[in-house]
Amino acid sequence: MTLDLTLEDPRWTILPPLADRAISATLAQMGLDPELCEISLLGCDDARITALNAEFREKPSPTNVLSWPAEDLAAETPGGTPLAPEPDFTGAVPLGDIAIAFDTCQREADAAGKPIADHVTHLIVHGLLHLLGYDHIRDEDATLMEGLETRILGNLGIDDPYTME
């Protein structure tokens, strides 16, 4: 897999191994060859993610993770499976970009009483599923996406994040 990892915040020492593990597990679950996928991941702080959230979502507040899919793969029908990424015969298929904020992740993990590594892994899986066309706005889509997240995290030995809330 091609992972373009940018660490803007020095506290993100755990991000490289977590990203490799979470992305590999997600792509495997989705039946995608990691060697044919390209993802950009930004490890930042709350100030940076607040600016990104304001710019792209018009929400000037911190959030845990943001994603920008390279192409719209969303299913047309509620609860439907998104389209598969189109193969790129010249190299890796760019799936999109993910940004994740250390401060918010740490706060949320502490509040939930779970290890930050587990929470960050969940958020990387979550962000990557967004790049692959999954969403959680409609109830049927949320059920599908959360089920995939739970299955992928279970394969990594991480408890269901939705039963810990």
UniProtKB/Swiss-Prot annotation:
Its annotated function is as follows:
Single strand-specific metallo-endoribonuclease involved in late-stage 70S ribosome quality control and in maturation of the 3' terminus of the 16S rRNA.
Name the record gives this protein = Endoribonuclease YbeY
Cofactor needs? Zn(2+)
Q: What class of enzyme is it?
A: hydrolase
- Record-linked PROSITE patterns: UPF0054
Q: Which family does it belong to?
A: Belongs to the endoribonuclease YbeY family.
The Gene Ontology biological process annotation of the record reads:
rRNA processing
* Source organism of this protein record: Ruegeria pomeroyi (strain ATCC 700808 / DSM 15171 / DSS-3)
